[in-house]
Regions:
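CheY-like receiver
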Residues: 66, 142, 179-182
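A conserved helix-loop-beta module that forms one wall/lid of the active-site cleft
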Residues: 99-162, 167
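ATP-binding N-terminal substructure of ATP-dependent carboxylate-amine bond-forming enzymes
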Residues: 1-104
């Protein structure tokens, strides 16, 4: 008996990333319907979808209600917050396939402390010196150990705005302590880690829980305003060369990035007993 294919797709989220996903789905020659559960009205998405509804994308019950109403067979979750809230878990439980990891596996993206601890636990060669804090105890001694080469990162999701780098955002240990104290005041866990010097790039991989297919290497530009003079954002734009690499990378660099993503996916599978399904985001220097 041939399995009936359900080509009713749900895209969760309504930013530029989700617009690109909707456009890719829309270009498919297959007969399909595209639905979007959005946080705001995006006219580009509205032009491509059969329905766009504003709702609480972090609430599993709301998402499932929309899925059941429209007979969705596969959901693609763009933002990280719904993943952190367990929306993917809830969708799988209702029989809907999901591009996006379950809550435990998503910690590789939603918790910087978890990511560092995982790399350290599995001896993956991509981990600078770091410590995790939930109070000010030990903050100053560790800053003094690192000297002027440190980065302070809010542990959770902050839309690309939770990272403060010595020299760029923090001009002294006193300023670093003030930022750390602000995180403690909002009950936030944070990490302080060694500042790495070099060109940053990202390499993402599609994962079906069994293997990975790698995307081109890209360089992400996060700072707002002309001349990169503004604060960090979730991303102002990216670029990649025609050969799917970048001018400052060679084949060995790309292979190392591939291997780190593969090792990370394998570590997650070993730790939680199931594979990571979704887009694995690797950030490198």
């Amino acid at each position: 008996m041939t399995e009936t294919v359900n080509n009713n797709f749900l895209v969760v989220g309504s930013g530029a990333r989700e617009h690109a996903i909707c456009r890719a789905l829309h270009c498919s020659p297959q007969e399909k319907k595209i639905f979007c559960l959005a946080t705001n009205f995006n006219p580009g998405i509205a032009d491509l979808c059969d329905d766009v509804t504003k709702g609480d994308i972090n609430d599993s019950d709301s998402v499932i209600s929309y899925v059941e109403k429209n007979g969705v067979g596969l959901a693609i979750i763009g933002p990280e917050n719904p993943l952190a809230c367990g929306v993917a878990d809830a969708l799988w439980e209702t029989g809907v396939k999901v591009v996006g990891p379950k809550k435990d596996l998503a910690q590789i993206e939603t918790s910087k402390a978890f990511a560092r601890d995982l790399l350290k636990e599995y001896n993956i060669p991509a981990c600078p010196e770091y410590r995790t804090f939930s109070s000010m105890d030990g903050v100053l001694p560790f800053l003094q150990t690192l000297g002027e080469n440190y980065v302070v990162k809010y542990d959770g999701l902050a839309g690309g705005k939770g990272v403060k780098v010595a020299g760029d955002h923090l001009r002294s240990h006193d300023e670093a302590k003030e930022y750390c104290q602000s995180l403690v005041d909002r009950d936030g866990k944070f990490i302080i880690e060694e500042k790495l010097i070099g060109q940053e790039f990202s390499l993402m991989s599609f994962s079906d829980g069994k293997g990975l297919k790698h995307m081109p290497a890209v360089q992400d530009h996060k700072r707002a305003y002309e001349g990169d003079m503004g604060p960090n954002t979730g991303g102002m734009g990216t670029y990649s060369d025609a050969n799917h690499s970048l001018p400052f990378l060679n084949d060995e660099d790309i292979n190392k990035a591939h291997n780190i993503n593969i090792a990370t996916a394998n570590a997650l599978k070993d730790k939680f007993g199931e594979g990571y399904k979704g887009i694995l985001y690797g950030g490198f220097i």
